[in-house]
């Protein structure tokens, strides 16, 4: 009986970590239980994070561009596994004038009860990002403003905001390169 319960619990956790939410409801993978419903369609870019030098980065400055955001953590296995493919996609898209590719993490991971002390500082995160070969911008949600705005409950989470500043889609879980490219192309 204990084995059956553990198998059931493991299945629930696995399903919970791979949900897809489409705010336009045009995909068969849409969920009516949208975590992005807390985000006003007109204010998806209305928040500020920090860059590696501690400077404010206001995402509203990217209005008029398609914005992809990857929320991740150094202690997250799926986050680490998807980085090589994210890097490949970044290399393909980085020179497009109408496109912004960002990653956001939190140096304190206050949003997550299982926070790993390895992420206590930006320096640790920057060092790990370099070790993993990340060349795309790594930004810091030091006040959990972005995580709260998007009702983040898991990492990795992928956010797609169109050039009108409207949240188009969220995807929670490890994303495959082909699917990421498909979602990015649908924003154009």
What positions do the PLM features span?
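Positively charged n-region of N-terminal signal peptides that target proteins for export
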Residues: 1-4
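C-terminal motif of bacterial Sec signal peptides marking the signal peptidase cleavage site
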Residues: 13-16
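N-terminal "domain-start" segment that seeds a small globular fold
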Residues: 22-59
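Conserved redox-active cysteine motifs that mediate thiol-disulfide chemistry
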Residues: 71-88
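Short, flexible/disordered intra-domain loops and linkers
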Residues: 109-119
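Short, internal strand/loop/helix patches
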Residues: 117-161
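Thiol-/selenol-based redox modules, centered on thioredoxin-like
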Residues: 154-188
């Amino acid at each position: 009986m204990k084995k059956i319960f553990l198998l059931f619990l493991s299945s629930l956790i696995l399903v919970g970590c791979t949900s897809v939410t489409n705010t336009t409801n045009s995909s068969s993978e849409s969920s009516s239980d949208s975590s992005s419903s807390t985000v006003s369609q007109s204010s998806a870019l209305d928040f500020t994070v920090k860059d590696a030098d501690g400077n404010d980065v206001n995402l509203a400055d990217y209005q008029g561009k398609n914005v992809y955001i990857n929320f991740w953590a150094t202690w997250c296995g799926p986050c680490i596994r998807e980085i090589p493919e994210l890097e490949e996609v970044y290399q393909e898209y980085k020179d497009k004038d109408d496109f912004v590719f960002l990653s956001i993490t939190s140096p304190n991971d206050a949003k997550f009860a299982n926070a790993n002390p390895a992420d206590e500082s930006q320096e640790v995160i920057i060092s790990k990002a370099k070790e993993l070969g990340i060349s795309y911008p790594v930004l810091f949600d030091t006040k959990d403003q972005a995580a709260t705005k998007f009702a983040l409950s898991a990492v990795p989470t992928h956010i797609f905001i169109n050039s009108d500043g409207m949240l188009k889609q969220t995807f929670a879980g490890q994303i495959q390169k082909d699917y990421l490219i498909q979602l990015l192309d649908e924003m154009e």
